Amino acid sequence: MVLLSIQTLPSSYPTLNNYTFNYRSQRQSQSQNQNQNQNQNQRRCVKIRSNVIRCGIAEPSGEPAPLGQKTKYNDGLFEKAFMTLFARKMENFAAKSASKNGSQKEEKKKGWFEYDYDSFVDVSRKVMQGRSRLQQQQVVREVLMSMLPPGAPAQFRKLFPPTKWAAEFNAAITVPFFFWLVGPSEVVEVEIDGVKQKSGVHIKKCRYLENSGCVGMCVNMCKIPTQDFFTNEFGLPLTMNPNFEDMSCEMVYGQVPPPFEEDPVAKQPCLADICTIANPSSSFCPKLQA
């Protein structure tokens, strides 16, 4: 009777197979929805992390803007913290310079994370005013030293003696840790004294040079003091070769920098088209004078 009853049920009546099929369909649908929600949450987390913790280029291509155009960046908390730290240290020297020149004005001090890259560059420009090339470089050295704990240079020398490994290691960590300052870069192979090693860093379009537009700021506030700091304080030679035609730069760890008088940058003229304080009539940037 039971078998007969099952056989005579209308075809539209939900049988056991129908229930099984519907149950499986519902489970698959729920699973797909859960996966979609998880993917959306993951994408949202990645977006939040990229916007808050790490900065990135905001250009559609993901690469620095073409020469003549200013690259757009999305700076996160990590980047703004470094901008604030450096800017506040340099503001002390900018205030001293303004006081000596009798042009000091009352300016409200910005809070943490209120600094952006433009304000960081602006402070650098104020430090440069009223100082010679050597004085500008000395300010940067003092700023860098003030950010290190006591005995840090000596510890660095012990951890990173001037070897191929130390040069390659520092090149590798330069790429992620200095993105906020110079923009995207990559480790490249270089040759030092006939030995090939991956201790070079190619900066695609230096953010500092792009925003300052000043040869003097590039050389006096970045290139020379950074070379000097690594070579003389840390004991790890470093040479930086900026390219003022495309705003790229090459950092070579393990290579001793030449004396300033023998460095090609010593005779570099102003970027008259973009520098606000350029002297087009001079054969080289006036800020490069001692």
Where do the model's predicted regions map?
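N-terminal accessory segment detector
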Residues: 2-30, 39-202, 207-217, 258-290
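Generic structural hydrophobic/aromatic packing signal, biased to beta-strands
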Residues: 177, 201-203, 226, 240, ...
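Conserved short secondary-structure elements within globular domains
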Residues: 211, 219-241
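C-terminal edge-of-domain segments
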Residues: 247-257
